[in-house]
Structures are given as C-alpha cells and as structure tokens.
Design a protein with these regions (language model features):
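Catalytic glycan-binding domains that act on GlcNAc-containing polysaccharides
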Residues: 74-222
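Short, Lys/Arg-enriched N-terminal segments with co-localized hydrophobic residues
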Residues: 1-8
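C-terminal segment of N-terminal export signals and the immediately downstream linker at the start
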Residues: 29-66
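Near-N-terminal "mature-domain entry" segment
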Residues: 52-86, 90
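N-terminal export signals
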Residues: 10-11, 15-37
C-alpha cells in the first residue's frame, strides 16, 4: 500500500480539543516510554492511604476465589494485595470528577489552555520522531497522539502514584460501578501474572489509569 505523506505539524487548541474527545483510542503508545522520567511524586493525600475497613476485607477474600477461577494464581494474588487496602479518597474522587462538575466549556478551557498548547508544541518538537513512528505503525495521526498524551498525563509528567490494585479493588467493592472496576482489577492482576511489571510499579490515577496515555488495565490488554 502507498504510505500517506506526513503533514506538517500544527499543534493548536483545536488539536487538543480533538484529543480531549478521543480518549478511547488504544494501542497508540509503544512499550518504550516517551519520556525517560516522571516528575517527583508528592506524598499521597491521607485519604489515599489504606484505611481499615472490615467490609472491604471480606469483599477481597471473596474476590480472591473469583479471581482464581479466572486464572489468577494464588501467588499473584498474595503479591498483588500485600500492603493494599481500602482508599476512601478514591471513592470521593469517583463521586466528584471534574468532567462531571464543570461545564464542558470550562473543562475544555482547562485541558486545552494556551500553556498546554505551548507545552504540546515543545513536546512534539522533542518526541516528533517517536510520534511519527506511532502514526506509521497504527495509523493514528501524530498530532492526535500528542494531544491525548497532553490531556491524559501532561506529556508524561503526571502519570499518578496510586497503587492500581488498591484503587480498582476499592471501586469494585464500593459498587457504584462495581462490575466495571472488577473487570479492571482482574485485568491488572493479569498484567502482574504475565510479569509485565511488579505490584510496586503498577501505579496510576485514582481510577486505575496508567502510564503516559492513562490507559485503564483492560485497554492496556486490548
């Protein structure tokens, strides 16, 4: 097939707004990181630290049986849940997402501000070659990948430091979107089962989104 020629890069507010509506894309980023380091993590808020909760503990005990029935080994479950726990702040954030509490106009002004556009141009200048490789491999325009990267993790500088197992198990236990988050928890456990990373390094947002593009575990697996 004839390969389509690349168009000159034009990072603009429009590119970032398009990126804000295209967050369902998967498979856009290669295994190698687009930036080499993450900004230093600040201490977690107290409500994002494990809090004793007997009902959560009982839920986890029952979940382990379901997880083993779906192929997760007892060894992986033991490693994954060591040091984890109920995170009340995760439930609070799930109830008060910015996308739901701000108007669309205010939200888009935040995620596609002039400083974000400027940062996007700089990020594209640094990583343009990698972004073009992604475009050639997956057919997703490099500018759109860069926009998603900026909206989701501020170009790799805000990838989150909340343990994914604690976050997804808390939300699965909470029940508002229990089935969805139990699926994310199972997928996260499969990531560990496959040896893709360690429990200590499996961190992300309060909702379990991970990495530069903040993919949830099931999207990572797709």
């Amino acid at each position: 097939h004839e390969q389509k020629k690349s168009v000159p890069m034009k990072t603009s507010r429009r590119s970032l707004l398009i990126g804000a509506t295209a967050l369902g894309l998967s498979g856009c980023i290669p295994a190698s990181p687009l930036v080499t380091s993450q900004a230093a993590s600040s201490p977690l808020d107290p409500d994002l630290l494990p809090t004793p909760n007997a009902s959560y503990d009982a839920w986890v005990a029952a979940f382990r049986t379901r997880a083993q029935a779906r192929g997760i080994s007892a060894a992986t479950l033991s490693r994954a849940f060591r040091g984890t726990g109920f995170l009340p702040g995760v439930v609070e954030r799930d109830r008060n997402q910015a996308e739901f509490t701000r108007t669309l106009e205010d939200y888009l002004a935040l995620v596609a501000s002039e400083p974000k556009v400027t940062a996007g141009r700089a990020a594209f200048a640094r990583q343009g070659a990698v972004l073009r490789q992604i475009e050639a491999r997956y057919g997703v325009p490099a500018e759109l990948v860069c926009a998603i990267w900026g909206v989701e993790s501020n170009f790799g500088t805000r990838r989150g430091d909340i343990p994914v197992i604690s976050a997804t198990s808390t939300l699965a236990f909470d029940g508002r979107r229990g089935e969805f988050f139990e699926a994310q928890l199972i997928a996260a456990l499969r990531i560990l089962e496959n040896g893709d990373t360690t429990p200590e390094r499996l961190v992300g947002s309060w909702a379990g989104a991970m990495g530069h593009t903040q993919f949830i575990p099931t999207t990572f697996e797709a």
